Amino acid sequence: MAREKFERNKPHVNIGTIGHVDHGKTTLTAAITSVLAKKGQAKVQDYAEIDGAPEERERGITINTAHVEYETDGRHYAHVDCPGHADYVKNMITGAAQMDGAILVCAATDGPMAQTKEHILLAKQVGVPALVVALNKCDMVDDEEIIELVEMEIRELLSSYDFPGDDIPIVQVSGLKAIEGEAEWEAKIDELMEAVDASIPEPEREIEKPFLMAVEDVFSITGRGTVATGRIERGKVKKGEEIEIVGIRDSRKTTVTGVEMFRKDLDEGLAGDNCGLLLRGIEKEDIERGMVLVKPGSITPHTKFEGQVYVLKKEEGGRHTPFFAGYRPQFYIRTTDVTGQITAFTAEDGSNVEMVMPGDNIKMTGELICPVAIEQGMRFAIREGGRTIGAGVVSKIIE
């Protein structure tokens, strides 16, 4: 049978459920599909289907993730849900499932727990822009006062991690009762989705951002000049435009004298295109893999940053032994390995850590030996002798 065509008539937003184990993330995800399916906006997926998510590999790291899609009146959503806590950590850090916003699921019976906090911190560190709270299992709490207290606690917690705790919508739901078809709880799922529609902003499309292309390869074409090839990460570029070459050495400006794709000339290259840019007055030696071509002034190179890092377990092909501050691995940034040093670590509770074990999720400070174009929210890998031993995301630029 012919495959269904993906209709692009509604804006597309990526979201996911986050929160403590057993607070009902997967049940809520199933409830959203069952309620929306009644309006023809989703395909029903039950708990077992979502929970039995297949393993995926992202940069050599095994992650279990369920992908569910549905739509509301105004939007099309791709929703990710992970069975295990470690899967969330890996997912959010590697950006395997990029989230434009998240539904934080918290059980009214328990209130915020350890992983509730950890997921809020992760969301902050990896740059999830907006959250909506689903206060789940509200059918099991008769006392309105308890619910109010839990809501206050969640708001305080969100504010302590620099989310707008007072303004984030908290919707009282019961995933289980909604799946069982109880009308009042089905209506609550609709209310939750209205809150998601209203509070999670539509992501800026890649093509509207300033131009950036990481250089993968460089050729010189006799009589025409030097061509840098790569995939345009964002924005667009036209023949005749001025661009800047940033990273590794001093930044310099040049003009694009041609855009080529599959050996044909293009008027302009767009985000997602693999293409070659012909650069005026640039020798092959002036440019190398790891540099980026950008809209002038839109990005500056840096050497020092903070990152949230997941260190691979030995079963995932990571190290077998711990490492300490002063450790010098390679940081694989966009298209190249750059040597650097990890100067300090901090645990989730903010305490200093002397030693990092395989399987840990930590905040670290890294320093590179040469400046490269790094920016907040950017993903990187930590490698040693060509194998990946960690995955990270830049949470803050220091210098």
Swiss-Prot record:
GO terms for molecular function: GTP binding; GTPase activity; translation elongation factor activity. It holds the Pfam family GTP_EFTU_D2. GTP binds at residues 19-26, 81-85, 136-139. Mg(2+) binds at residue 26. It is found in: Cytoplasm. It comes from the Bacteria. It catalyses: GTP + H2O = GDP + phosphate + H(+). Keywords: Cytoplasm, Elongation factor, GTP-binding, Hydrolase, Magnesium, Metal-binding, Nucleotide-binding, Protein biosynthesis. Residues 10-204 form the tr-type G domain. Residues 19-26 are annotated as: G1. Residues 81-84 are annotated as: G3. It is an enzyme of class 3 (hydrolase). Its EC number is 3.6.5.3. GO terms for cellular component: cytosol. Residues 136-139 are annotated as: G4. Residues 174-176 are annotated as: G5. PANTHER family: ELONGATION FACTOR TU, MITOCHONDRIAL, ELONGATION FACTOR TU-RELATED. Monomer. NCBIfam families: EF-Tu (TIGR00485), PRK00049.1 (NF000766), PRK12735.1 (NF009372), PRK12736.1 (NF009373), small_GTP (TIGR00231). GTP hydrolase that promotes the GTP-dependent binding of aminoacyl-tRNA to the A-site of ribosomes during protein biosynthesis. Belongs to the TRAFAC class translation factor GTPase superfamily. Classic translation factor GTPase family. EF-Tu/EF-1A subfamily. This is Elongation factor Tu. The gene is tuf.
